[in-house]
Regions:
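The serine-hydrolase catalytic nucleophile loop
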Residues: 69-81, 95, 305
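Catalytic histidine-centered segment of alpha/beta-hydrolase-like enzymes
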Residues: 325-336
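Alpha/beta-hydrolase-fold enzymes
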Residues: 150-247
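Conserved alpha/beta-hydrolase
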Residues: 82-102
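Short beta-strand element of the alpha/beta-hydrolase
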Residues: 57-67
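Alpha/beta-hydrolase active-site loop
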Residues: 108-129
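Short beta-strand/loop motif that positions the catalytic acidic residue
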Residues: 287, 293-295
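N-terminal cap/lid segment of alpha/beta-hydrolase-fold proteins
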Residues: 11-57
Length: 352
């Protein structure tokens, strides 16, 4: 759908009332479907989770989002519901342009707007009668880990920040995801920019936005290619182990959701442009609040977490490396490796 085809491009796409998550509904929490606006006027849709035994006291709250290209019915909802079982008011939300949230065209990401989405979630939580607005934290999973740290460096209302198997999406798109290090050379970056800006001409001429994979490859001859989808419809023979990790979650019943970009399609093809020139962690050194960065021992993304940990300025920071865990092990608890107890203790200690 193009921007011109809707009378209210910022309105929610839907607000499904039935339980349609990839995880079981807990009998220990109350659940509400909610909506709220960010400062760009885009209406975000979220799931609010509240402990059933909360009484009348005001509670600490946590906004949760991610992974990049996922929806609140997947990993972020599981984290939010589990933390709510342990006494927090939590909000898992769909970022702008994705899931049930508003914004046209669909399947767009941008570092500024997505950082703002976290602050808008703080706005919403701070207005709820069950919440003590002086005790709000945020948690970002995968690519939303970088967004969470960016928000924490700017939004002084956030009192604690945590990440799980984080990606720095500016670095990932701007320098390529390699084997524990950046993949692009300077000439590779220039070739990717040429490729993306050629796509802008095509989009302008066609009056529509093409979609394609955001992980763009440059071969030894300088040829640039990108997949049509984030994940293939079927897994190839002898797949890359990281591709198989993602496929086994997003494309299989374990984690598939029809509204998830990662499960069913791709971002707009030009989505990497703003990430390439707007580093998310430029001000990580100004983060002064308690910070917890969790990653997996075998996660291909581990280097993002370790480098972000070094960059964070807080004196109260902790890096947790989960033994034996790969990246997607911390999306759901299929392998029993998500350290929910450490997330719970971190927020209980620092949101009191």
């Amino acid at each position: 759908m193009s921007y011109a085809e809707t009378t209210n491009p910022n309105a929610p796409v839907s607000m499904v009332s039935t339980w349609d998550k990839t995880f079981a509904e807990s009998d220990k929490v109350d659940h509400r479907k909610v909506s709220f606006q960010n400062r760009y006027g885009i209406t975000l849709v979220g799931d609010l989770y509240l402990p059933k035994n909360r009484g009348d006291r005001k509670l600490a709250a946590i906004a949760v989002s991610g992974p990049f290209g996922a929806v609140k019915e997947q990993s972020s909802g599981l984290y939010a519901q589990t933390l709510a079982e342990n006494g927090f008011v939590t909000l898992a939300f769909d970022p702008s342009y994705t899931g049930e949230s508003g914004g046209q065209p669909r399947n767009v990401a941008a570092p500024d707007i997505n950082t703002e989405d976290f602050s808008a979630a703080v706005d919403f939580l701070g207005l709820q009668k069950e919440v003590d607005r002086n005790r709000i934290g945020i948690l970002g999973i995968c690519g939303w880990g970088g967004m969470a740290l960016n928000a924490a460096s700017m939004d002084t209302r956030v009192k604690a920040v945590a990440t799980s198997v984080m990606y720095d999406m500016s670095r990932a798109m701007g320098h390529g995801v390699g084997d524990g290090k950046d993949r692009y050379s300077t000439s590779d970056r220039r070739a990717v920019l040429q490729y993306l800006n050629a796509q802008r001409w095509k989009d302008a001429e066609n009056g529509t936005f093409a979609h394609g994979g955001h992980d763009i490859y440059v071969d030894e001859n300088g040829k640039v290619t990108a997949a049509e989808r984030i994940l293939p419809e079927t897994l190839p023979d002898n797949p890359n182990p990281v591709l198989k990790e993602f496929f086994d979650y997003y494309r299989m019943p374990r984690g598939f959701h029809a509204r998830s970009v990662n499960s069913t399609g791709a971002w707009t093809a030009t989505t990497p442009l703003s990430f390439m020139n707007m580093p998310l962690l430029s001000y990580a050194g100004e983060i002064t609040i308690p910070t917890l960065i969790v990653t997996g021992e075998k996660a291909h993304s581990r280097y993002f977490a370790e480098d972000a940990f070094k960059a964070v300025g807080s004196k109260q920071k902790e890096l947790v490396i989960v033994p034996g865990a790969n990246h997607v092990d911390l999306y759901d608890n299929a392998a029993g490796k998500i350290p929910f107890g450490q997330f719970e203790q971190f927020f209980k200690t620092n949101l009191k």
